[in-house]
UniProtKB/Swiss-Prot annotation:
Complex formation: Component of a cohesin-like complex composed of ScpA, ScpB and the Smc homodimer, in which ScpA and ScpB bind to the head domain of Smc. The presence of the three proteins is required for the association of the complex with DNA.
GO biological process: cell division; chromosome segregation; DNA replication
Protein source organism: Exiguobacterium sibiricum (strain DSM 17290 / CCUG 55495 / CIP 109462 / JCM 13490 / 255-15)
Function description: Participates in chromosomal partition during cell division. May act via the formation of a condensin-like complex containing Smc and ScpB that pull DNA away from mid-cell into both cell halves.
Top-level taxon: Bacteria
Protein name as it appears in the record: Segregation and condensation protein A
A Pfam family per the record: SMC_ScpA
Phylogenetic lineage: Bacteria, Bacillati, Bacillota, Bacilli, Bacillales
GO CC field: cytoplasm
Family that this chain belongs to: Belongs to the ScpA family.
UniProt subcellular location: Cytoplasm
Length: 251
């Protein structure tokens, strides 16, 4: 009969086969019987050979090692500490076998978790970030300063990232939300009272995402109405007043 090679029940190796047999026998991994496991393993290998299947050499090596370990179990041996187990391949012991099986099982379970995460990720689809410049009204691109709309967007993005990644260690207390008109008045009053401010410096406390968005929109509207102007200042943006009276705000 022509010899051919098969993957025995999709086992990845001798340790995988051993785990399968231990699970089938419902034996505690920490309290395995070397004699029973060896008999089951050798019987499985012999069955494969009886079918004239090409058994990988690593399975045969494990069979020989288990038989050697079984014979050693018949002799009185000293109790071995799990924390100081000799290499199983160099000096086969029951504790060494258990340790190898435990490590292999841990890797196998981790591989299964990663496989599940990979399959879940394949069901997700990434989306490229939108170009917000396409929504800009060409008639409102003059911001009465040395900044472009994209500069303001970059400043907003920096602040948004700070909000997203900063860890809040104190208890969160929800602040009263403001409308766009109310925030415009609040921003303009702050700029007038402080004779200017920076975009980051305006937030005396850690803002929420909602507060950050409405504040950014308020700044855009105030710039559009020529109430405040924006100027580049290092990595921040300087806001300064362009009108003398606060009541000139068109809200």
């Amino acid at each position: 009969m022509e010899s051919y090679s098969v993957k025995m029940d999709a086992f990845e190796g001798p340790l995988d086969l051993l785990l399968h047999l231990i699970g089938k026998l419902e034996i505690d991994l920490y309290d395995i019987s070397v004699s029973i496991v060896t008999d089951q393993y050798v019987s499985y290998i012999r069955a494969m050979q009886h079918l004239e299947l090409d058994v990988a050499s690593e399975y045969l090596v494990m069979a020989a090692t288990l038989l050697q370990l079984k014979s050693k179990q018949l002799l009185p041996v000293e109790q071995t500490d799990f924390e100081d187990v000799p290499d199983f391949e160099e000096d086969p012991t029951r504790e060494g076998l258990i340790q190898q099986l435990i490590e292999y099982k841990a890797y196998k379970e981790a591989a299964l978790v990663l496989k599940e995460k990979e399959e879940a990720r394949l069901e997700l689809f990434s989306k490229q970030p939108e170009d917000l410049m396409t929504y800009l009204d060409p008639d409102n691109q003059d911001f009465s300063g040395n900044l472009s709309f994209s500069d303001l967007l970059r400043a907003y993005e920096k602040m948004r990232q700070r909000v997203a990644w900063k860890v809040r260690r104190s208890k969160t207390v929800k602040r009263e939300e403001r409308t766009l008109e109310q925030q415009m008045i609040h921003v303009s009053e702050y700029v007038f009272a402080n004779e200017g401010t920076t975009f980051f410096g305006f937030f005396t406390e850690q803002p929420t995402v909602e507060e950050l968005v409405v504040s950014f929109l308020a700044v855009l509207e105030l710039v559009k109405q020529c109430v405040v102007a924006c100027e580049q200042m290092s990595d921040d943006i300087l806001l300064r007043a362009l009108v003398k009276e606060e009541n000139q705000i068109g809200v």
